[in-house]
């Protein structure tokens, strides 16, 4: 069967990370999924199609505009997929537990207190569940960040440049993530640094 909601081919940034996420995710029809920092729905739409009507996907993003855009794209399709506004660092304790928690390019937004945010997130994972997060770790994509910084400088975006440089300076490493997950008591912790091609225009 041809998927109706594949990962978008025209997104050179989110899709490569989402492909890695799907490669690592052990997803079954009927699973319940919490997708954090869902953005424009990559890979929430794809996840919802995979779990089917017996499952559920709650996709959370802090930006109201992103949520409205994703709902507009969804229309009446896949009613078991729900987009909601929320801060993944401070999710309400009334949320249920999920079989899977995913976050594509989300871990970078946990700053400044990543361990505390991760600890809050893990409490929503069912026993035996799986957490899969993708993020550009320390020492990766440095040539890309230089290009972004140069473009921001050209546009006089000094506030944005400052925020970017703060992020670059305090990026977590893969070992940081592994240590934090183990401290939180997760089992079978696997941290992979996967080479990705992110196309840029010079």
List the predicted regions and their residue ranges.
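Conserved alpha-helix/loop element of class I SAM-dependent methyltransferases that forms part
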Residues: 12-31, 46
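A short acidic, Gly/Pro-enriched loop at the edge of an enzyme's catalytic core
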Residues: 89-101
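Conserved catalytic/acceptor-binding region of the Class I
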Residues: 128-201
